[in-house]
Amino acid sequence: MKSTLLGLATAILTAAGSAHAQDSSSGNAEAGAAVFKRCMACHQIGPDAKNGVGPVLNGVVGRAAGMYPDYSYSAANKDSGLTWDEPTLTTYLRAPRKLVPGTKMTFAGLSKDQDIADVIAYLKQFNAQGQKVSP
């Protein structure tokens, strides 16, 4: 009987923890704009964005890796076969060189899950032309 109650309590706490983890992973675009300032040394976003050290990030969410026009991507990035969906971006932003060994991106990654979710929410606001669109 005690083991049944213990198992039930464990299941309830695990479910509650999972629900909380899902809630905390939803991103806030406004907070993401602040996190994105760390990316601006290499990347631009918006209607007047231009490639620099890194490619323009307009419309990046949903785009195939290594495909923004007029940017010289590493072979590793071009040949990765990745699509920048939310799960892939989450993994990449946590440790870029781990997901794509040989990438030109020198940034080590974001350590906080909420920062990653927030910056993805920020990126999702911009279409391929750099216009803000409704999420």
Model-derived features with residue positions:
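Protein kinase-like catalytic domain
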Residues: 43-46, 127
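Gly/Gly-Pro-rich "capping" loops immediately C-terminal to redox-active cysteine motifs
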Residues: 29-33, 47-86, 104-107
